[in-house]
């Protein structure tokens, strides 16, 4: 086995989601200590994603008994569209907080980033599909219809499940 460590210079990188060989494993800053990434020797496809940024992908050759560090650098996506002044606010109260959050099938961050007293996401008014998923837990899905300026909250506690139940969004970046 070889260890893969991640280095991110800014909060953007540290809050980005990580996929290894097409499987979501968590967000960058948590992948250490008891959640450190140990991989079988060989080539592995690493993907890092964050809303509003271009996907970062790299193939890593993992050698047995070694520690590899991947420096992650996210760059803004000029095609990203952000809500205007009529945006609605959606707060997520989700357990576990490390679960991946998808809005309209696009990864937007981990659940802990959109909950608590000061955290939420801004969405354009209208209908949106919200999906919260984490390997080893059952996926939560709901649809929200938001009005301009509306404040809403979604609460969910993901029940334990099997890795076999992981949705395609969790399996493929």
Spell out what each predicted region is.
Residues 1-173:
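Short loop/turn and low-complexity linker motifs enriched in small/turn-promoting residues
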């Amino acid at each position: 086995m070889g260890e893969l460590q991640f280095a991110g210079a800014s909060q953007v990188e540290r809050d980005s989601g990580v996929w290894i060989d097409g499987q979501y494993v968590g967000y960058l800053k948590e992948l250490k200590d008891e959640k450190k990434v140990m991989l079988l020797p060989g080539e592995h496809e690493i993907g890092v994603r964050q809303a509003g940024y271009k996907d970062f992908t790299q193939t890593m050759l993992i050698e047995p008994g070694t520690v590899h560090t991947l420096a992650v650098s996210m760059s803004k996506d000029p095609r990203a569209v952000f809500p205007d002044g009529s945006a609605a606010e959606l707060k997520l109260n989700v357990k576990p907080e490390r679960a991946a959050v998808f809005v309209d099938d696009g990864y937007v961050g981990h659940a802990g980033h959109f909950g608590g007293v000061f955290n939420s996401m801004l969405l354009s008014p209208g209908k949106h599909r919200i999906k919260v998923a984490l390997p080893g837990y059952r996926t939560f899905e709901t649809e929200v219809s938001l009005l301009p300026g509306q404040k809403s909250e979604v609460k969910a506690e993901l029940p334990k499940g099997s890795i076999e139940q992981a949705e395609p969004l969790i399996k493929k970046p």
